[in-house]
Amino acid sequence: MNKKLHSVSPESGPNSNLDLTPQLAQSSSAFLFEPKNIVPFETALGWQKNFLKNLIEEPFSPQAVWLLEHFSCFTIGRGSDKKNLLFEENNSPLPVFSIERGGEVTHHMPGQIVGYLVLNLSLHKKDLSWYLRELEQVLIDVLDLLGIEGKRVDGLT
């Protein structure tokens, strides 16, 4: 399979180690983080906040794609309506986390792979539509590698 995935590299600049080997830190603009075990949501959120802090302090540090599984929990985005939980938050059957992302309620559970992009978007176009289309193209390319046809629908992302 010689297909090349769609990619957009950030501008070049010095890299910092970020607990990577020096060779990887100097040769990578991004890396994949994929733990072997289930990661509690609150642990992953703490890791992401620390990684983001470092990315802000060292803007040309390697960026990351994290692929994780979480124990069962619910997350609620900034714009979410809590009535979409379908139960009282203080009487939840599972932990509930209000987090700094868009979107509605998400139920996470073992077996579900969650992808987090930890990127310095200031190194790319400051255009949400462009970013979403680039992300969409990466997913279309991955589907193609798996032998599944993916396509865009005009007006939707």
Language-model regions, residue ranges each:
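N-terminal lobe of the biotin/lipoate ligase/transferase fold
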Residues: 1-157
